[in-house]
Amino acid sequence: MKTAIFTVVLALAVFAVLSFGWEANEKALSEEFTELIHEKEAASETEARECRYFWGECHDRMPCCDWLVCRYKWPITYNICVWNRTFPEK
């Protein structure tokens, strides 16, 4: 009976140690993933376009490109960039 209790206690101790190691590994992976997301976010902000292209949503902070104009078009409920019938200069 003593060996059975000792075996159960030993097994619980082993499971506790393994569980602690798994949690530490999971937390490290979570932190690494968060850092990766922040790096990708920063990279996408630097690659932001200077103007909105055709059918893109437009507003004061993000105007349309030179050959487009910002207009309200039904049934779309926001302003979009549409062609102003000119061609961009190259």
Swiss-Prot record:
> Which tissues carry this protein?
Expressed by the venom gland.
Molecular functions (GO terms):
ion channel inhibitor activity; toxin activity
Q: Which residues form the signal peptide?
A: 1-19
Pfam families (UniProt xref): Toxin_12 (PF07740)
Coiled-coil ranges from the UniProt annotation: none
Q: Which residues form the propeptide?
A: 20-50
Query: Which of UniProt's keywords are assigned here?
Result: Disulfide bond, Ion channel impairing toxin, Knottin, Secreted, Signal, Toxin
Q: Which InterPro entries match?
A: Huwentoxin-1 (IPR011696)
Say yes or no: keyword Disulfide bond present. Answer: yes
Disulfide pattern: C51-C65, C58-C70, C64-C81
A GO CC term assigned to this protein in UniProt: extracellular region
- State the SUPFAM superfamilies in the record: omega toxin-like
Tell me where it resides: Secreted
Q: What broad class describes the main subcellular location of this protein? A: secreted
Keyword Secreted among record annotations: yes
Q: Domain note for this entry? A: The presence of a 'disulfide through disulfide knot' structurally defines this protein as a knottin.
Family, according to the entry, reads as follows:
Belongs to the neurotoxin 10 (Hwtx-1) family. 13 (Hntx-13) subfamily.
Stated role: Ion channel inhibitor.
What is this protein identified as? U7-theraphotoxin-Hhn1e
User: Which organism does this sequence originate in?
Assistant: Cyriopagopus hainanus (Chinese bird spider)
